[in-house]
Regions:
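Short, small-residue-biased leader/transition segments that mark boundaries at the very start
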Residues: 1-5
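Short acidic, Pro/Gly- and aromatic-enriched capping/linker segments at domain boundaries
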Residues: 6-20
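Extracellular/periplasmic catalytic domains that process cell-envelope and extracellular macromolecules
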Residues: 20-21, 216
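Extracytoplasmic
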Residues: 32-254
């Protein structure tokens, strides 16, 4: 094997090549083919609900029995996915009911919109609700990111009942969230994710979380979000609604 790795290329095995198969010709090689790994960051869109566990849970009927994964319906649907392994949560006391089947919002709710709603424009036709209370938190793993610098943009969903967050009234600071990557305090930033919305109109909106953040290693990363808006303990309409996060590469000229 040592000689093969030193050669750094795979060779055809003559006796095992040109073998007729049903859908083509088989050729045997004597080593692994090398894997190519980009060193240049690429655009990544991270859908917070795009997990196999969520799909299996919803389609298995463990949530709202009328809900189908990534599917628009005549009515809105919400399933409780708080216990799934893709979400690590620390829920605190909340002024908002956590009974998502009776007008409240689960600690982590998987939501699909109704036909005709602006939320049908969500990535993959779904989004998540967070009802974790003041200083409650959630940790998730990102998709693989190539080492490099990125601008990070959060796509949020907004309803008119959240106007007090948009206007930063009734004790709200705009839906402020504290973001941290990989437990590194140097990456921590607090952003009022609804304060930049200019009109009280149901829809999807972008909020810049980082103008620039650098990841030194290629791989997945842990992202923690802490609810830093005290209105979570005082307003029964408080919740956070998220669609996806975009990692936009920053390519610097050499």
């Amino acid at each position: 094997l040592g000689d093969v790795y030193k050669r750094q290329k795979a060779m055809f095995v003559e006796d095992g090549s040109d073998v007729q198969a049903k859908n083509g010709i088989l050729h045997e090689i004597d080593s692994w083919l090398p894997l190519w790994e980009s060193e240049i960051p690429v655009l990544v869109e991270w859908d917070f609900a795009d997990y196999e566990e969520v799909a299996a849970w919803v389609n298995g009927g463990y949530g709202d029995p009328d809900q189908k994964y990534q599917t628009v319906d005549e009515g809105e649907h919400q399933s409780d996915v708080s216990s799934l392994a893709c979400y690590t949560i620390d829920a605190k006391s909340s002024a908002t009911s956590t009974d998502g089947s009776n007008g409240g919002y689960y600690p982590v709710g998987y939501a699909t919109p109704k036909t005709g709603s602006a939320w049908t424009n969500c990535k993959n036709k779904d989004h998540i609700y967070l009802n974790l209370g003041y200083n409650g938190s959630i940790i998730m793993k990102t998709p693989i990111l190539i080492a490099g610098k990125y601008k990070v943009i959060l796509k949020v969903t907004y309803a008119t009942s959240m106007n007090f967050m948009r206007t930063m009234t009734s004790g709200s600071n705009g839906g402020k969230i504290r973001f941290t990557f990989d437990g590194d305090s140097e990456t921590t930033t607090e952003i009022p994710i609804y304060a930049s919305i200019t009109a009280n109109t149901l829809g999807l909106y972008d909020t810049v979380i980082y103008d620039e953040i650098e990841f030194s290693k290629t791989g997945t990363h842990s992202m923690k979000m802490v609810i830093a808006d005290p209105a979570a303990t005082s307003n029964s309409k408080f919740r956070i609604q998220l669609d996806y996060m975009t990692f936009e590469p920053i390519i610097e000229d050499e």
